[in-house]
From Swiss-Prot:
<keyword id="KW-0479">Metal-binding</keyword>
<dbReference type="GO" id="GO:0005886">
    <property type="term" value="C:plasma membrane"/>
</dbReference>
<keyword id="KW-0813">Transport</keyword>
<comment type="subunit">
    <text>NDH-1 is composed of 14 different subunits. Subunits NuoB, C, D, E, F, and G constitute the peripheral sector of the complex.</text>
</comment>
<keyword id="KW-0408">Iron</keyword>
<feature type="binding site">
    <location>
        <position position="137"/>
    </location>
    <ligand>
        <name>[4Fe-4S] cluster</name>
    </ligand>
</feature>
<dbReference type="GO" id="GO:0048038">
    <property type="term" value="F:quinone binding"/>
</dbReference>
<dbReference type="GO" id="GO:0015990">
    <property type="term" value="P:electron transport coupled proton transport"/>
</dbReference>
<feature type="binding site">
    <location>
        <position position="167"/>
    </location>
    <ligand>
        <name>[4Fe-4S] cluster</name>
    </ligand>
</feature>
<dbReference type="GO" id="GO:0009060">
    <property type="term" value="P:aerobic respiration"/>
</dbReference>
<keyword id="KW-0004">4Fe-4S</keyword>
<keyword id="KW-0411">Iron-sulfur</keyword>
<dbReference type="InterPro" id="IPR006137">
    <property type="entry name" value="NADH_UbQ_OxRdtase-like_20kDa"/>
</dbReference>
<protein>
    <recommendedName>
        <fullName>NADH-quinone oxidoreductase subunit B</fullName>
        <ecNumber>7.1.1.-</ecNumber>
    </recommendedName>
</protein>
<dbReference type="GO" id="GO:0008137">
    <property type="term" value="F:NADH dehydrogenase (ubiquinone) activity"/>
</dbReference>
<keyword id="KW-0997">Cell inner membrane</keyword>
<keyword id="KW-0874">Quinone</keyword>
């Protein structure tokens, strides 16, 4: 694998289709809070900030997610954690326990029999907690919409913050959904939801 060096950018791996990140997003370049903090530190030598702004900023860079992989979307979710997409570079690290997680990714077909388990796992997560619904089946039943055993959207069981469409959605779509969740947390805050 070679490296491509664009004229005004950093080195990009040759197999990444000319992109160093998804949609050209770099959290350190486009984060207004980070820009304000670094400017204030350069001017005064110290930082003053509201505690909830600081907590919100820290929380967006350290989201812990747990998987609730139910079908083929879980394969794409696993791919998003691998080195090519590397969700951990955005501060989005996996956890095995719901008690240590901030985000739950529901990926795949939710059946009536599995719905109580989904709700139980959601209730075990500490506040503030967020849910990403990944794929057509989790969003609204998808291909199995008319089946007697399928819940037509996981939002009937738990509140969903971000919907990632597709059947199955690509790993890039999930990374984009994670970035949208981080923007939503910055916009709404985390102390009171």
């Amino acid at each position: 694998m070679g490296v491509i060096v664009p004229g005004n950018s950093s080195p990009v791996p040759a197999l990444s289709a000319g992109r160093s990140t998804v949609e050209g997003y770099d959290p350190k370049l486009h984060d207004p809070f980070f820009d304000g903090v670094s400017q204030q530190l350069a001017d005064k030598g110290f930082i003053t900030a509201a505690a909830d702004d600081l907590i919100t900023w820290a929380r967006t860079g350290s989201l812990m997610w747990m998987t609730f992989g139910l079908a083929c979307c879980a394969v794409e979710m696993m791919q998003a954690s691998m080195p090519r997409y590397d969700l951990e570079r955005y501060g989005f690290a996996p956890r095995a326990s719901p008690r240590q997680s901030d985000v739950m990714i529901v990926a795949g077909t939710l059946t009536n029999k599995m719905a109580p388990a989904l709700r139980k796992v959601y209730d075990q997560m500490p506040e503030p907690r967020y849910v990403i619904s990944m794929g057509s089946c989790a969003n609204g039943g998808g291909y199995y919409y008319y089946s007697y055993s399928v819940v037509r959207g996981c939002d009937r069981v738990v509140p969903v913050d971000i919907y990632v469409p597709g059947c199955p959605p690509t790993a890039e779509a999930l990374v984009y959904g994670v970035l949208q969740l981080q923007k939503k947390i910055r916009r709404t805050g985390t102390i009171e939801r």
